[in-house]
Each structure stands twice: as structure tokens, then as C-alpha cells.
Amino acid sequence: MTEVLDILRKYSEVADKRIMECISDITPDTLLKASEHLITAGGKKIRPSLALLSCEAVGGNPEDAAGVAAAIELIHTFSLIHDDIMDDDEMRRGEPSVHVIWGEPMAILAGDVLFSKAFEAVIRNGDSERVKDALAVVVDSCVKICEGQALDMGFEERLDVTEDEYMEMIYKKTAALIAAATKAGAIMGGASEREVEALEDYGKFIGLAFQIHDDYLDVVSDEESLGKPVGSDIAEGKMTLMVVKALEEASEEDRERLISILGSGDEGSVAEAIEIFERYGATQYAHEVALDYVRMAKERLEILEDSDARDALMRIADFVLEREH
């Protein structure tokens, strides 16, 4: 795991440099500070690193994908700022959320300006066909993120969400941006159509595994590792693969009990919900689905020539399920 973190640190520095070049001219100073708050707060920077590694894995120069990598991270940060407002989350990456420090109006503006700067980051690479194609990928991912968020919000009022609907939601909300990172990075590296498709699939599959593993950690990890109470997704009534599976498989009595616990905010009942997950194999099922997606992601890399970048992508796929938060 340490080796993967070193890889991410090395490649994220390239993206961070381009990000700071793009946002340094934001005025007034209050908006600049609000905009850079989460960017400088840390995070693993998996998405921009994947863009750079995908470029390198097809024989390109990672620097050629720096604009795309920066754009992907700017879009991710914009989405986090707005998510925190919508969910009224007060902490992010161990720091107070942007809206907590600067208020909601300024936080909305910070998200908006980062969203705008993302496109500036891409077009700084010129107007070649590669840049145009990569820009189209980035634009499409932004639409999907909004669609995914809307689906997620709609699920809060439903108890009949199917597994297919859930997978569509997490693909759009989480995996689409990761797939955009790997696809756009490959395009900037001059990849063949077959390589672009393979790397897009790789990003999609590890993105799906990433979100499912997040849901899984919420019930099997501990508060210290998570940085939040175990089962907080259950207390908040969030729809996860485990909830979908348990509601589908449970007896009428257990189903009604689980429904009464979801979104109740009662942390004392969370353990009971987790027991219901275990009873019907929902927890193990989620873990196995995530494992399958990682396996499929690694298989898609087999068409690439052996290289350090390809090896790093393989390691990152495994890292998705090795992380504890």
C-alpha cells in the first residue's frame, strides 16, 4: 500500500502544479482561498494520477495529459464542495467544509469557478484533435455526475431500488469521472481505439469497485479508520448495494425492521442493521462484487505492453480494495 501511495504522490504533483497555475489568478482573495481549500487539504489524488498513468501506459508523455489530469481533479473538487452543501456535511478531508468556513453562497461560487477552470486546464493544451476528443470526454463526465447525484437523491424516497438502478447511479456519480480520467489520459497519449476502450473500461470498473468498497467499509471498518461512526450510511438512510441486497432477500419481518432503521439517525440500531446484512449475505455479496470489478479492470490492462505505468495501474486496482478509508 505504501508503494501505491508513493506512486500517487509522484504523479499527483504533476497535476497539482497545473491546477495551481490555473487557479492562481482567481480574484478576489476570498474566492481564491475558498476555491483552493480542499485542493490543499490533501486527498489521495487517485483520479489525476490515473489520467497521467494512462497516458504513459500507451506510450505517451505524462506531461501531455497534465491539463486533463488537472481538469479531472478540479471537477472532483467542485463536486465535493457542492455535495457537502447538499448533504450539510461539515467536515471533508479532516478539515471544515468550504461552506462551513465561508458560507454557502461563497462555497457555491468556489465550486462554480473550479468547474469553469477545469475546462481552461484542458484547452491550455491547444486545439489539436486529441485535446478536442479529451475535452468531449470531460464534458460528458460532468453531465453524468449531475445525473448520478439526481438519481441518488431520488433513491432517498424509495425502497424498491433495484441492483441495476443502484449500479447505474454509482457509475454516473462516481465511476464516470474515473473512467473519464483514464480515457482522456489515454487519448492524450495517442492510444489506439482499442487501448482507449480498454482504459475507459478499466477506469469504470475500478470506479464501481471503489464506491462499493466504500459502502462495505462503512459496516466492517472502525470509527478511527473511517473518521466517522461505523454504519453512518445506514443511520443517514443512504442506498447501498448491501441495503438493496438485504431488502431483496430478507424475510418480511427483517425487511420491515431494516426499513425502520434506515435513515432513523439512531446509531444504536445500526448494529442490528449490520446483523441483517450478515444474515442474508449482503455484506459478503458487496465485497465479492467489488472483487469481480477489480479482476475485470486488471484483465482490461492485458492488451497494453508491459511497462512501469501499466504495473502501477495494476497496483492501483488492488489498492482500491486494500484501503481502509
Swiss-Prot record:
Record organism: Methanothermobacter marburgensis (strain ATCC BAA-927 / DSM 2133 / JCM 14651 / NBRC 100331 / OCM 82 / Marburg)
Residues engaged in binding isopentenyl diphosphate: K44, R47, H76, R93
Cofactor note text: Binds 2 Mg(2+) ions per subunit.
Residues that, per the record, bind Mg(2+) 1: D83, D87
PANTHER family according to UniProt: GERANYLGERANYL PYROPHOSPHATE SYNTHASE, SHORT CHAIN ISOPRENYL DIPHOSPHATE SYNTHASE
Assigned protein family: Belongs to the FPP/GGPP synthase family.
Subunit text: Homodimer.
Protein name per the record: Short chain isoprenyl diphosphate synthase
Keywords from the named record: Cytoplasm, Magnesium, Metal-binding, Transferase
Key word Cytoplasm present: yes
Record-level GO BP terms: isoprenoid biosynthetic process
E.C. designation(s): 2.5.1.-
GO CC, alphabetical: cytoplasm
Ranges in coiled-coil conformation: none
GO molecular function: metal ion binding; prenyltransferase activity
Subcellular location: Cytoplasm
Tree of life domain: Archaea
Gene assigned in the entry: idsA
Pfam families, per the entry: polyprenyl_synt
Binding locations of Mg(2+) 2: D83, D87
List of residues binding an all-trans-polyprenyl diphosphate: R92, K173, T174, Q211, K228, K238
Cofactor(s) listed: Mg(2+)
